[in-house]
């Protein structure tokens, strides 16, 4: 993964800069682009796949919460999703500055179009890019098809198997829920040589987590941006 920014953790706008005064919807193109003037080092966004197999930027399995539509993302073609305001990965890569660090969270295992979209944008070397996921199969597939890209295993709760999973997958690091920082469990993961990232910092008080030793990146939103 890219080095820390000037010796500090990278700050990644979680699902872009959404809500608040700007009113941008999470994971929308305006939200992703709004990360640039905030001074964030990069953006984090979620990826699923349309019915016609293209990577699209949305967190949930269905459109209900974000778009008021009960249909599943996988039931619609990418063009239909775009008309509803769901961008494709290609849309985002074309619009975002090359210098912006990208944390691409795969909600499901990737299809070939995912790798093609990134390679078309000359991101094959893996610079300024990390692939994160809670899904072991997704991380395993990326490791096989694009071993040059950094990978993080996302972790929500402590478990004795996480260290073994991470090492077996050969990931570069773990991205953990903020309340886990400072625990012996996290220290053990770092001692095993795994990079450490954290999610999601939302308040000014949460900014204290940025001083955690060895932290390389943090997903931020709201006051913590």
Question: Can you say where each PLM-predicted feature lies in the sequence?
Answer:
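Phosphate-group recognition and catalysis centered on beta-loop-alpha active-site segments
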Residues: 1-225
């Amino acid at each position: 993964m890219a080095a820390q920014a000037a010796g500090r953790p990278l700050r990644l706008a979680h699902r872009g800069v959404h809500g608040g005064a700007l009113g941008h919807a999470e994971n929308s193109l305006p939200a992703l682009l709004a990360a640039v003037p905030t001074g964030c080092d990069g953006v984090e966004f979620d990826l699923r796949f349309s019915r016609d197999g293209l990577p699209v930027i949305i967190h949930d399995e269905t459109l209900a919460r974000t778009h008021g539509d009960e249909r599943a993302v996988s039931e619609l073609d990418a063009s239909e999703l775009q008309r509803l305001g769901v961008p494709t990965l290609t849309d985002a890569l074309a619009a975002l500055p090359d210098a912006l660090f990208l944390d691409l969270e795969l909600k499901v295992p990737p299809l070939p179009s995912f790798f093609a979209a990134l390679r078309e944008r000359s991101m094959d070397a893996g610079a300024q890019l990390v692939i994160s996921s809670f899904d072991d199969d997704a991380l395993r597939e990326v490791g096989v098809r694009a071993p040059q890209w950094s990978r993080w295993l996302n972790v929500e709760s402590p478990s004795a198997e996480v260290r073994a999973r991470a090492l077996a997958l050969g990931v570069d690091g773990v991205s953990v829920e903020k309340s886990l920082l400072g625990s012996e469990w996290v220290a053990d993961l770092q001692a095993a040589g795994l990079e450490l990232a954290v999610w999601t910092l939302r308040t000014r008080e949460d900014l204290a987590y940025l001083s955690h030793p060895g932290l390389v990146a943090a997903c931020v939103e709201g006051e913590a941006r």
